């Protein structure tokens, strides 16, 4: 695997083999994700071609709008921020239909291009779509490739000694997030300035490319209110009221945040249609640093002092869990579970029809009652063997059994104390 250069550090993206495989199979590979996740750097590492165009360049953008076919003549070619010129995708389609060969086009975009109907229709049967998440902590630090410890939880022969242990520092990673430029900034005050600039760029450029928004201040207020509800069930009526927006406008703005790869609505898990379950999704952000900045969290002390610190720990660990899912989206899914009596499990990992239930705790102490939600989930499942195991991820350092079926495992390796600095 080639290494890629991000600012002053060499970083190997776990995602790279998946992009390379896609390019061996299909004529078009579409790589999406939030701005500043490293899509361009990854694309150039996968396909070191001289034919590279970015539609952030006004000259290239004008060429794409006036003569899109001219950008498809030299192949293989990388075209960045392709959502800025949807007609260009039609030219790509024509080029593929004239001479179909694998790996001809690598397109990137800061928008989920599947939601743009004209693009999705044009590339049907010609493209593989991949979504690059921001870095998770262990990927940034170059540790434990491909999140093997999470995969091992699905195996019957998993042993406690395999689970990594180490000092954790979730507020550190909550504030850092996973955008490479932000991760390179060593102090919180400078990082806060960067996050503010990021939001302005998103509002003034990326958002307007996706849809007309009549009031950017209204949209930013909605972002702040949504960030303050990180990890919670989405009550759209309450969110609309607090943001002083209509429900239809709130729904549309949430759709735009999701289409822009900024936020996601985590869907609830159900295995038994007769059980009374909550069907409302939960809100999580693709980048925990952005979410915490929007919510007004400016320091590690402020994060740990919050009454809702548990939700922010969940958001921090979600950074790793979404990476786990993104590495194999066809066979992996991420859910949560909650019934109408309030029993819940924070995250459910699904892999090829089998499940691992995870409960998240900030505490350094854990006891069997902390797994009560996992036990309740197990009781509702028709196929109880499908739930391979449950685990309470907690702030201590000792992996151990809580019961015959459930484990207590430290989350420290997923948000480690970073001895390497920035």
Give a label for each model feature.
Residues 90-113, 120-122:
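Conserved catalytic/switch belt of AAA+ P-loop NTPases
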Residues 395-422:
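Domain-level recognition of nuclease-like catalytic cores that cleave nucleotide substrates
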Residues 1-20:
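N-terminal pre-Walker A segment at the start of P-loop NTPase domains
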Residues 3, 183-355:
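Accessory nucleic acid-recognition modules appended to NTPase machines
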Residues 2, 112, 118-228, 232:
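Interdomain motor-coupling "hinge/lid" segment immediately C-terminal to the ATP-binding subdomain
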Residues 39-40:
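Conserved lysine of the Walker
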Residues 28-31:
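Hydrophobic anchor at the beta1->P-loop junction of P-loop NTPases
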């Amino acid at each position: 695997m080639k290494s890629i250069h991000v600012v002053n550090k060499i970083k190997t993206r776990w995602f790279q083999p998946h992009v390379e495989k896609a390019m061996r199979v299909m004529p078009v590979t579409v790589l999406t994700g939030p701005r500043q996740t490293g899509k361009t750097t990854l694309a150039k590492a996968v396909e070191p071609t001289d034919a590279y165009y970015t539609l952030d360049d006004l000259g290239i953008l004008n060429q794409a709008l006036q003569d899109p076919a001219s950008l498809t003549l030299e192949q293989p070619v990388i075209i960045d921020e392709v959502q800025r010129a949807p007609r260009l995708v039609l030219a790509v389609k024509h080029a593929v239909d004239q001479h179909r060969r694998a790996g001809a086009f690598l397109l990137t975009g800061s928008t989920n291009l599947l939601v743009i109907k004209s693009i999705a229709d044009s590339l049907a049967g010609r493209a593989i779509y991949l979504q690059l998440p921001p870095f998770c902590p262990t990927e940034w630090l170059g540790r434990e490739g491909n999140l093997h410890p999470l995969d091992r939880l699905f195996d019957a022969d998993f042993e406690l000694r395999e689970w990594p242990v180490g000092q954790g520092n979730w507020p550190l990673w909550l504030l850092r997030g996973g955008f490479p430029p932000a991760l390179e900034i060593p102090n919180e005050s400078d990082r806060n300035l960067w996050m503010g600039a990021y939001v302005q760029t998103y509002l003034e450029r990326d958002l307007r490319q996706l849809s007309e928004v009549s009031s950017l201040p209204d949209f930013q207020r909605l972002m702040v209110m949504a960030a303050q509800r990180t990890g919670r069930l989405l009550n759209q009526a309450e969110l609309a009221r607090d943001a002083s927006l209509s429900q239809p406008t709130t729904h549309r703005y949430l759709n735009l945040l999701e289409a822009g790869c900024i936020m996601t609505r985590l869907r609830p898990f159900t295995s038994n249609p007769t059980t009374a379950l909550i069907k409302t999704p939960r809100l999580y952000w693709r980048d925990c640093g952005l979410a915490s900045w929007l919510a007004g969290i400016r320091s590690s002390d402020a994060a740990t002092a919050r009454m809702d610190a548990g939700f922010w720990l969940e958001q921090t660990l979600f950074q790793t869990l979404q990476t786990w899912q993104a590495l194999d989206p066809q066979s992996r899914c991420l859910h949560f579970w909650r019934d109408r009596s309030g029993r819940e499990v924070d995250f459910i990992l699904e892999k090829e029809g089998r499940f691992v239930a995870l409960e998240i705790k900030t505490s350094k102490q854990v006891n069997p009652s902390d797994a009560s939600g996992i036990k309740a989930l197990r009781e509702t499942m028709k196929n109880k063997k499908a739930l391979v195991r449950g685990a309470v991820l907690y702030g201590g350092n000792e992996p151990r059994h809580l019961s015959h079926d459930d484990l207590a495992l430290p989350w420290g390796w997923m948000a480690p104390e970073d001895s390497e600095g920035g």
